[in-house]
Swiss-Prot record:
Gene name, Swiss-Prot/TrEMBL: citD
Family the UniProt entry places it in: Belongs to the CitD family.
Subunit structure: Oligomer with a subunit composition of (alpha,beta,gamma)6.
InterPro entries: CitD, Mal_deCO2ase/Cit_lyase_ACP
Primary role: Covalent carrier of the coenzyme of citrate lyase.
Organism: Streptococcus equi subsp. zooepidemicus (strain H70)
Annotated protein name in UniProt: Citrate lyase acyl carrier protein
First and last residue of the signal peptide: none
Length: 102
């Protein structure tokens, strides 16, 4: 999926995450994470975001993630929403997304 514009999903409320995604002209995935639990879960959060991006077919984007203690399902949902908004996609393939959790 091609990232065409800047998009945001989520909030800075407790137990949530704000994901900002933008195009970066073919420089791969650049991920910046700001998390209050980075020492304990930073590697896991990064891996989850990158896996979700790979599942969506995103090969090039800059992602800024500000985590406020979000659960995995929230991180994945915010990433999916931001990618679809940034790509201009209006219809989700729920069967494909659901298959990731099999």
């Amino acid at each position: 999926m091609e990232i065409k514009q800047i998009a945001v999903a989520g909030s800075l409320e407790s137990s949530d995450m704000m994901i900002t995604i933008s195009p970066n002209d073919g420089q791969g995935i650049v991920l910046e994470l700001d998390s209050s639990v980075e020492k304990q879960f930073g590697n896991h959060i990064r891996a989850l975001i990158k896996t979700t991006l790979a599942n969506l077919g995103v090969e090039s984007a800059t992602i800024e993630a500000v985590d406020k203690g979000a659960l995995d399902c929230t991180i994945q949902a915010r990433t999916i929403a931001a990618v679809h908004r940034a790509a201009g996609v209006e219809h989700y393939n729920w069967k494909e997304i659901d298959s990731w959790n099999a």
